[in-house]
Amino acid sequence: MIRTLVHAKIHRATVTGADLNYVGSITIDEDLLEAAGIWPFERVQVVDVNNGARLETYAIVGERGSGTIQLNGAAAHLVNVGDLVIIMAYAQVDAKPEEWEPTVVFVNEQNAITEVKALLPVGGR
């Protein structure tokens, strides 16, 4: 059976900008996109840890090493600069739970990568 599973997660990144006048999307530092395996224009879900808002948009490439996490367009209404967000991308796969290992990118307050690891199922392997 094909299921939709999270394949990539950027965990607790800090929002650095919000631009209402941009045409949409979330701008993400290229280093973070590469580490997570998220492609430019890939659909992502963004969850604001501070206010509980959840939204879907698509990723665009931000300057490498900049730490940029910027919500653009209408989504900018749902976050504040300084909020913590979790960014997730999903894939449709035909895999058993014990075979699936999404990539999780952990960052510090400046959105620099501190750790990249596979998220194991509950109970590990």
Curated annotation (Swiss-Prot):
Its cofactor is pyruvate. Pfam families: Asp_decarbox. Its EC number is 4.1.1.11. It comes from the Bacteria. Pathway: Cofactor biosynthesis; (R)-pantothenate biosynthesis; beta-alanine from L-aspartate: step 1/1. One of its GO terms (biological process) is pantothenate biosynthetic process. GO terms for cellular component: cytosol. Its main location: cytoplasm. It catalyses: L-aspartate + H(+) = beta-alanine + CO2. The modification Pyruvic acid (Ser) is found at S25. It is found in: Cytoplasm. The active site is at S25 (schiff-base intermediate with substrate), Y58 (proton donor). Keywords: Autocatalytic cleavage, Cytoplasm, Decarboxylase, Lyase, Pantothenate biosynthesis, Pyruvate, Schiff base, Zymogen. Is synthesized initially as an inactive proenzyme, which is activated by self-cleavage at a specific serine bond to produce a beta-subunit with a hydroxyl group at its C-terminus and an alpha-subunit with a pyruvoyl group at its N-terminus. Substrate binds at T57, G73, A74, A75. GO terms for molecular function: aspartate 1-decarboxylase activity. InterPro entries: Asp_de-COase-like_dom_sf, Asp_decarbox. Catalyzes the pyruvoyl-dependent decarboxylation of aspartate to produce beta-alanine. NCBIfam families: panD. Heterooctamer of four alpha and four beta subunits. Belongs to the PanD family. This is Aspartate 1-decarboxylase. The lineage of its organism: Bacteria, Bacillati, Chloroflexota, Chloroflexia, Herpetosiphonales. The gene is panD.
